[in-house]
Design a protein with these regions (language model features):
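Divalent metal-binding pocket/active-site signature
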Residues: 18, 44-45, 52, 106, ...
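Hydrophobic residues within beta-strands of alpha/beta enzymes
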Residues: 36-38, 111, 159, 199, ...
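A metal-dependent hydrolase metal-coordination microenvironment
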Residues: 2-144, 246-249
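Charged catalytic cores and adjacent phosphate/nucleic-acid-binding surfaces used
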Residues: 1-10, 21, 166, 172-280
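Histidine/acidic residue-rich metal-binding segments in metalloenzymes
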Residues: 57-67, 71-75, 82, 103-105, ...
Length: 280
């Protein structure tokens, strides 16, 4: 399988990352990947403990990594894995212009749009301000917000971890299901298909549900009905990622997730080079 694991983070560039680019590339080679990408956090709406925004200097990022790029589409047998330079855009309406500008001004191979804050709160630190009603109500609002982000950031290539907020809900059984937000999911998927944006399967959520909520591996997998509905509506652009922030997270439970997806008929995962869509 020609697999490109594009959503990963590095120490220094992402405040919550610790791995180096060398470690990431070594892990990619060990795993036999076709390619790997970096996509560090660019969340102008989030603040670190000192009050500074959760962003990096894109000019310095390009100076550090752009010349190291290797296009997976040009990879030959025996070559090391491809290496792509992307960005994860933390969306909120008030920072929309900032996000549009950064991907206009810098030649990222791909951009990932994501929601990390909701109602101006971080679910990791202020869950009590987010999960204030039944899960179906919270998840409906969340998915509509993700749909808003996909609609606004039409130029973004990938919509990240739709199930991110299931990681931090106080309920023991917090896995996100299609039945939680059917109309919102349908709206999101239609927007994504219109924009030719890929749906990300984020193995980080699988790992989080197992670690935080004691889910069995098979039960932590993405909801089958969500994926079936995306396909039913005409969606066929999938990516799968480790969302690794630390060395030990690279490929963690990736093979099991791939096997699960294969059982649903999902066997092809796309990637983006110079913002152009590639299929295996």
């Amino acid at each position: 399988m020609r697999l490109v694991d594009a959503h990963n983070h590095l120490g220094y560039w992402s405040p919550d990352g610790t791995q180096s680019v060398g470690e990431l590339l070594l892990e990619a080679e060990k795993r036999g990947l076709h390619g790997v990408g970096i996509s560090d956090h660019y969340d102008p709406d989030c603040e670190m403990s000192d009050g500074s925004p959760w962003t990096f200097d894109p000019k310095a990022y390009m100076e550090a990594f752009y010349s190291k790029r290797r296009m997976p589409s040009k990879r030959q047998e025996g070559d090391p894995p491809g290496f792509l330079v992307g960005i994860e855009l933390g969306w909120m309406p008030e920072v929309s212009d900032v996000l549009h500008n950064v991907i206009r001004d810098y030649p990222f191979d791909f951009s990932i749009v994501s929601i990390h804050y909701f109602r101006n709160y971080d679910p990791f630190t202020h869950a009590e301000h987010i999960y204030t009603s039944k899960l179906h109500k919270v998840y409906t609002e969340v998915i509509h917000t993700i749909a808003d982000s996909a609609q606004d950031m039409k130029e973004a290539n990938i919509v990240a971890h739709f199930d991110f907020f299931s990681r931090y809900a106080p309920e023991r059984d917090s896995k996100m299901h299609y039945e939680h937000a059917p109309e919102a999911f349908d709206r999101l998927f239609r927007i994504m298909m219109e924009n030719k944006q890929a749906l990300e399967i984020n193995v980080g959520t699988v790992n989080s549900l197992m670690k935080r909520k004691d889910y069995a591996l098979k039960d932590a997998m993405p909801d089958e009905k969500i994926l079936d509905r995306y396909i039913e509506l005409g969606g066929d652009l999938f990516t799968i990622c480790s969302d690794a922030h630390h060395v030990e997270q690279n490929g963690l439970h990736m093979n099991e997730t791939l096997q699960y997806l294969e059982s649903l008929g999902i066997t092809e995962f796309v990637w983006f080079e110079e913002r152009e869509l590639f299929r295996p």
